[in-house]
């Protein structure tokens, strides 16, 4: 059971791992391992049959740990390398959705070193109305996601300065529903 890691989602990963371990230990021998500098040594030492990936965010959901495990020929839970990388990249995902005629909010991608206040506001006004949603392109669990008005846009963009790329998209109000899928089977829908 791999968890923790270095991402902004470390704490939620540890909570996930705690719940997973509680359930799996009833029927399986579990070794919990932090995704840290000793990860490769632990793989060698414990020779796992399968890795349950409880990592969240960078390194855990972006194809990184998956590529390590595939190179070591270790089975794991989670999507594969390419699907993980594409799912974690919000712009790549949106382009795939559009190509497959799946509706997705309109968006603008900005390099953070190229944030020009007037340019951003002009582009937003041209494409859609306020409020807008801003977020880093490669984070999950709603980390650093803001719903912005014209008044607080620049202040919130400043909070995202640590990210290389930022996504600004139209805000669509309503309920948020998550659907789990395993293979081609829908496991159920949950309102968040």
Give the residues covered by each predicted segment:
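Short, hinge-like loop/turn segments at secondary-structure boundaries
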Residues: 70, 94-98, 123-126, 150-152, ...
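ATP-grasp fold ATP-binding core
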Residues: 97-98, 124-143, 163-177
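Structural detector of well-ordered beta-strand residues that form the stable sheet scaffold
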Residues: 77, 105, 133, 167-169, ...
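Glycine-rich phosphate-binding loop of ATP-grasp-fold ATP-dependent ligases
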Residues: 13, 105-107, 131-156, 176
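Phosphate-binding site of ATP-dependent enzymes
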Residues: 149-192
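Short, glycine-/small-residue-rich phosphate/pyrophosphate-handling segment
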Residues: 89-110
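ATP-binding N-terminal substructure of ATP-dependent carboxylate-amine bond-forming enzymes
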Residues: 1-82, 86-88, 92, 111-119
């Amino acid at each position: 059971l791999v968890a923790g890691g270095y991402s902004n989602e470390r704490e939620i990963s540890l909570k996930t791992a705690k719940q997973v371990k509680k359930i799996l230990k009833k029927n399986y021998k579990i070794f919990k391992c932090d995704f840290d500098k000793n990860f490769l040594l632990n793989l060698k030492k414990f020779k796992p049959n399968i890795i349950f990936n409880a990592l969240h965010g960078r390194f855990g959901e972006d194809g990184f740990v998956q590529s390590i495990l595939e190179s070591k020929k270790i089975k794991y839970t989670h999507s594969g390398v390419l699907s993980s990388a594409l799912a974690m990249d919000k712009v790549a995902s949106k382009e795939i959705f559009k190509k497959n005629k799946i509706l997705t909010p309109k968006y603008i991608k900005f390099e953070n070193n190229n944030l020009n206040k007037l340019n951003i506001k002009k582009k937003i006004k041209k494409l859609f109305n306020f409020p807008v949603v801003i977020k880093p392109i490669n984070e999950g669990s709603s980390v650093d996601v803001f719903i912005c008005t014209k008044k607080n846009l620049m202040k919130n963009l400043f909070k995202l300065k640590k990210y290389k790329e930022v996504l600004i998209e139209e805000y669509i109000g309503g309920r948020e529903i998550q659907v789990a899928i395993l293979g081609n089977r829908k496991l159920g829908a949950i309102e968040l």
